[in-house]
Each structure stands twice: as C-alpha cells, then as structure tokens.
Amino acid sequence: MWRTLRLNRWKVLCLLLGGAGLILHMFPHDLEWLAFIRQDDPTAECAHLRAAARALSYWGDFAGFNTIIFVTLGFFAFIRRSPFFRRMTIAAVLGTLLTGSLANVLRVSTGRARPASHLNPGFHGPSLSAKKHSFPSAHTATAFGASIPVAVAFPPAGMPMLLVSSGVAWSRMQNNCHHPSDVVTSILLSTLFGVPLGLMVRRSRSGSRRPA
C-alpha cells in the first residue's frame, strides 16, 4: 500500500489539497446544509426516516456492519479456498483499522462540538467528551474504510457495501450527530487508504492469472 501511495504521490497530494479546500469551504455552511439534509417534520414519512436512520447508525458501527463484512468475506475465502478473497478480507480489515484509528485521533484532538451537543459550534481543542467528538465521523470512516477496498478490488461485492456505507453516513447527519463536513472528511480519509489497498488486491489477482 505504501509503495502505491509513494508511486502516486502527486495524485495523493492533489487529493489532500483538494479535500482540504473542500472541507474548509464546507465549514461555514455546515449548519445550513445539515438543516437541509435532516428531515425532522412530525409526519409519518419522517418518522420512518428517523427510524431507518437510528437502525443504520446502530448496525453501521464497527461491531455491526464491519464485523458482518469481515465474517462474510472470511467465510467465502474459507469455503472457496480463495487467496483473492483472503486478501480482500485483509484489505477490508486494514482499511477499517487505518481509517477508523485516524478518525478517532482527529476526533479527540480537534474537539469539535456535535450539532446536538448544545455547545458553542466549532473546534474546542483536545477533549475526551463525546459531545466534542464530531470531526470526523467514526461510523462513516469505518464503514467506508471497509467498503472502498472491496469496491476497488471486486465491484460486484463492493458496490452494495458502498450503498450501505452511504446510508450510514446519511444516518449520522439525520441523527444530528455530525456535520456534513465531518462525514465528507471521513469519506476522503477512507479513499486515501482504501483505494491503494483495493488496487493491491486487484493487481494480485491479475498477476496470478498470467500464464507462466
């Protein structure tokens, strides 16, 4: 993975600079955009949306969505005796751990107030309070951290996972736990780690098919 990042360092730099610019542009508009995204009307339809958001957030964390992915991929690797699926499982685990760990370090370090915290909006500095762990979204980071490597390596399995991950990201905003920029930052971090991991798995499969 690190070799892939090094070989594509200019693309990585462009991603980092472009992503930083996007996030900085989003900060002043976060509350406005969050109000537009969230559906909080006292109607039956919105009640169903809120219930779906709660379910996605509950099952979309590391112990839920990610564990299901790891077990499913590992099961296929075992049943099919497939080195490809085994590598894909490892890539999903690494993507989750790398992205999730970085997201948690940033959350504790920046201390951004959650939208529902009733604290002054903004960054308050290092904090262990869950009310100040908004930036970035850990749920989104771990969900996309597992999905992106699989989507790059094996799209038929990865694309449905990306749809679920997108639902998890939406649920974090619908539940008033994160700002839009928190979610987008997590997706960018997942892309940074997930694409190289997925490419490694895909290339290893292509290499194994070459005739001797």
Where are these regions (language model features)?
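N-terminal transmembrane-helix/juxtamembrane module of multi-pass inner/ER membrane proteins
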Residues: M1-V71, R107-S129
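Membrane-embedded catalytic cores of phosphoryl/pyrophosphoryl-handling enzymes
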Residues: W2, L119-A212
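Interfacial segments of alpha-helical transmembrane regions
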Residues: V12-L13, G74-N104
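Aromatic-anchored segments of alpha-helical transmembrane domains
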Residues: A20-M26, T99-S101, S165-N176
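Alpha-helical membrane-inserting segments
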Residues: D30, T72, L102, L106, ...
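Membrane-helix interface segments
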Residues: H48, R81-R87, F154-M159
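Transmembrane helix-loop junctions in multipass membrane proteins, especially transporters and channels
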Residues: F78-F85, V108-A116, C177-S181, R202-G207
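Hydrophobic alpha-helical transmembrane segments of integral membrane proteins
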Residues: I90-P115, S181-T191
